[in-house]
Amino acid sequence: NDVFRNGVAATLTTTDGASRGSQSRNSIGTNGSYFFKGVAQEIITYASDESDNRLSIEENIGGYYDIPLPGLLDENPGAAAAYSLRRLRQAYTGSAIQVQRADNVGGTTDIGFDGYGDLDTAALTTAAAGNSMVVTTWFDQSGSGNNATQGTSANRPKIYDGTTGVIVENGKPAVDFDGGTDTLTHSSDIALAACSIFTTLTAVAAIRVWYGETDQNYLATFSGNVTCTASTSQRNAVHTPSGQTLYNYTRNGSVGGTWYKNSSPLTTTGAQTNQTLTLNSIGGFSSYKHAGPIQEIILYNSDQTDNRPSIEDNVGDYYGIEIAGLLDQYSGAAVAYSLRKLSNSYTGSAVRVQRADNVGGTTDIGFNADGGLDTDALTTAAAGNTMVVTTWFDQSGSGNDAVQNSTAGVRPKIYDGTTGVVLENGKPAVEFDGTNDVLLTGVDFLLRGTFSVAKATGTGSVFGSSGGAEFFRSLNSTQYHFRNNDSIKFTTDTTVQSLLYAANDTTSELAVNGAPAITSATLQTDGFDDFRIGNKSATSTEFLNGNLQEVVIYETNQSIIRAGIEANINFFYDIY
């Protein structure tokens, strides 16, 4: 069981009752021995696990009762500066912006947030009283005090139009910079060696600087490129501005740096050296100014590669920006089986299911709006019956679906007629019975970068090949065995795991839950023939006893981008 207080997971001091089933009492205010003293406003009880819906339920309640909930900076703390038109931190009690009439008549007004943590547009509208309003100060929510201000009325960006109302972009408030004179400047420079900078904006012109200090320190979109310049060293990426976009520039403080657009990496050029990036002006500098809305800028003076999926998902979800899936960011997979959507361009389903008793036809189950398995559609199709997987669709685009045409009880389960959707760590899973469940592909390929999310019990193969010389198996609750020409056995203290197998010119390696597990000096060259999921080989009685959620396989070495792939997987499945 999990307990949350105002959206934050509570630390449980005991696990007593964690496995208890139904509760017999239905009285409010007492359990028969202890009585509640205080006021109660709302109690809602579900007879089902609502983990997937918890955030939306909490947001609804928190918004109505004006209870601040955790924000992006609670989940990913440590920002050097953070400017936004939504509340980013639960403990933040300040305002979002300070505004004044564009004609400089009257005083300033601080505009905060409504109960849902959004900009208080009602207060902004009241302050405007039909006049255009501009931003005098954009408050820093990081706690560092780097408020960005503009003392000259004519150089202030607009937040409210006297004719059309609140400036919005994709339905959310935005600060509109005119591309001419508008800037907001903080008095202290922010110097960044290692850094991650997340910016949500819309560029309406090809050559625009959105954050900078001088012509040697800035972030900008130029014709055909998005650019970071630190001192005299540039890091560019081929890019054409197109509508509302989440940009992220990340570097580790030594060399290089990577540009991401809506979470998808851009091809970078320019060998940026270890130069400090100094910033102090939102909207640009000199004659290089940004034209268009800016909604959020968050700066970290550290490399946030491990937290990037979490930050980008948070931003994308709030602003309605479609964030790139795993295969959009890291393309080229030979096969990809998952119960989440791995690519924004994928239009197929996740699985095809049928009743376990083979009554009725099959039903294709796709994804919900958040990219997870459409468990509502699965529950409807089940109609109280146990459901099994007949096909696990390949999302790589190669058409290598894993199927089981036999109806003789050899299909893995995805829905239990009594307990509902099969789950592992709160996410849907395909359950293999350890006896005879297997999905077949009929495909032969090399394994040079293999990522899987599985929980196995006892001895059983997560996947294998027709001949049985190549497989990945669980030996017991803590030890695993990978074989592909050379055997690699390794031990781990956890059974839910992310696996990497990658071969290069001289060695092969395995990593579990983001950490290297073992390296073999033997290059593993054999290919998997007739790749199968849940079984060691065509003649073996060794089957997977446990749950499988994702298998993504590349035929090329993925060591360089392993950390990014594992961060993506771990963010979704919360493995380690």
Predicted stretch roles:
Residues 20-49, 235, 275-304, 488, ...:
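Extracellular glycan-interaction patches encoded by glycine-rich segments
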Residues 14, 19-22, 58, 268, ...:
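A generic alpha-helix structural signal
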Residues 34, 109-113, 117-125, 216-219, ...:
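Parallel beta-helix/beta-solenoid repeats that form elongated, surface-exposed shafts/blades used
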Residues 1-18, 45, 80, 85-88, ...:
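Extracellular glycan-interaction surfaces
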Residues 39-46, 54-159, 168-176, 181, ...:
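GGW-centered surface loops in extracellular recognition modules
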Residues 51, 265, 305, 539, ...:
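Surface-exposed, flexible loop/turn segments at secondary-structure boundaries
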